[in-house]
Amino acid sequence: MFQLPILNFSPQQVAGVCETLEESGDIERLGRFLWSLPVAPAACEALNKNESVLRARAIVAFHTGNYRELYHILENHKFTKESHGKLQALWLEAHYQEAEKLRGRPLGPVDKYRVRKKFPLPRTIWDGEQKTHCFKERTRHLLREWYLQDPYPNPSKKRELAQATGLTPTQVGNWFKNRRQRDRAAAAKNRLQQQVLAQGSGRSLQAEEESGGEAGGAASSPAVSLSSKAATSAISITSSDSECDI
């Protein structure tokens, strides 16, 4: 029978390799390395207690679409707070992707809220504090800086920015997509506001010419008032510049 080569690595050495490959973002090599690890009961027991190895297995499970394995790892092993942020992102993103596949469409903020309510974070990767699902100010600042340089980052830049912010490449991509949508909506809102104001000015000038004198001034007031209300309505068409639920 063919025998797999036995790697004489200590659990600490295995953990070090996992951490290095995780930081490099080379998920394919990380997966191959995990597959090559020994399956002897004694070795498995030691590795199954190592957080770096467990985190690496969770990351590989996520990137290969093996969400059942991901959930099993996260629900059955207690992780330290240093790993919570990344593992929480994997948990939520996996459930989001499953929901999108089931519904056949991208999820909106309300959809994501419902998914989070249905699949709350397990206490193994959560300390019980409520999470706002908004990015920290430092993260938003970095994202905005990169957005001003390039609103359409390629996959390599997304991975680089993900490492700089502690987010996943998918989260980075979603933020850029949502930001582009908000900018387009804001531009459309401004155009509509200018059109409404221009129409209101035209109506009031026409009313003044037709009525003349004080009567004309009185007649123009409803038109000006109407244009102001329309402009106000136009301003509220788009939502606020929210950066939550990404």
UniProtKB/Swiss-Prot annotation:
Comp. bias regions, Low complexity: 217-246
Protein name: Homeobox protein SIX6
Tissue: In the developing embryo, expressed in the anterior head-fold, the anterior neural plate and optic vesicle. At later stages expression is maintained in the eye, while brain expression becomes limited. Not expressed in the lens placode.
Residues in coiled coil: none
The keyword DNA-binding is assigned to this record: yes
Record-linked InterPro entries: HD, Homeodomain-like_sf, SIX1_SD
Organism: Gallus gallus (Chicken)
GO molecular function, one term: RNA polymerase II cis-regulatory region sequence-specific DNA binding
Any single GO CC term annotated in Swiss-Prot or TrEMBL for this entry: nucleus
Nucleus among keywords: yes
Record field: compositional bias (Polar residues): 195-204
